[in-house]
Regions:
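Partner-binding and oligomerization surfaces adjacent to conserved cores of proteins
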Residues: 1-254
């Protein structure tokens, strides 16, 4: 499966050198409804197997769940769309290449080559989108148990981490979530690097960084049209740049 990770050029440099993706704080999610559904706990039940909890115990449990959720981190990817491949999303490029230098970068990653650790635990899944996000109801758990909050979050992870509001559907997101993992080893998993336009500074900079690599190719994106530049020497690269210029002058690729 192909995964696409959009990022800034400055971040790409670090990713390429280290061959790792860093997990980001889950609380930095761009979907306010996603965060709100976690903090909108409904007092579904204070009873568990005939045991009734006091309001103080129940309130403390909810607070512990808040804290537990905030310990989780995530890495977000984009999947292929029905109409086009994941690297060619106009809205995703609008987020990451909107400056005048169009300095956004998209990495194509072969998911089968990602080195997922056995420990700590990692959860990964395609995000589903809902027009109405329901809160995660607190109930069916012994609130006085020492690790009650931890078990509750694991049990309800699909609703907590893998559902977003319908308005974010264009992201077509695939998400990797972990509580303890700080970075993901993607050495050997990057198959292509994508930039927006053949005449921007970002493409020139990337060419100097990975020109000698046989693992990665360049993809020039003009709208939804593309021309792939595989690893090559500088002469071949410049020759194809002239070809791109000629194609664009003639009205683009057919």
């Amino acid at each position: 499966m192909k995964l696409y990770h959009y990022t800034k050029f400055s971040n790409f440099c670090s990713i390429w050198i280290q061959q790792k993706l860093k997990f980001s704080e889950w609380t930095n999610s761009n979907d306010v409804y996603e965060r709100e559904k976690i903090y909108n706990f409904t007092q579904h039940s204070k009873e568990y197997k005939g045991k009734m909890f006091t309001s103080e115990v129940f309130h403390q449990f909810v607070q512990n769940v808040y804290k537990e959720v905030e310990h989780y981190k995530q890495i977000s990817f984009c999947l292929d769309y029905e109409e086009f491949e994941g690297y060619a999303s106009p809205m995703m490029w609008g987020h990451y290449a909107r400056d005048y230098q169009r300095s956004g970068v998209c990495l194509e990653i072969d998911s089968s080559k990602i080195k997922f650790p056995q420990i700590p635990k990692i959860y990964r899944k395609k995000v589903s989108y809902r027009k109405n996000l329901t809160p995660t109801h607190v109930g069916g758990v012994d609130a006085e148990m020492k690790n009650a909050a931890e078990l509750f979050v694991v049990k309800n992870r699909n609703n907590l981490f893998f559902k977003k509001h319908w308005h974010w559907k264009y992201e077509n997101e695939y998400r990797i979530v972990s509580k303890e993992c700080e970075e993901l080893d993607i050495s050997g998993a990057i198959t292509s690097v994508y930039v927006l336009g053949e005449d921007n500074v970002t493409l020139q900079s990337i060419s100097h960084i990975i020109m000698d690599s046989e693992k990665v190719g360049f993809l020039n994106v003009g709208g939804l049209r593309s021309l792939k530049l595989n690893s090559m020497n500088l002469y071949e690269y410049n020759s194809i740049q002239e070809e791109i210029k000629y194609i664009n002058e003639k009205g683009g690729l057919s």
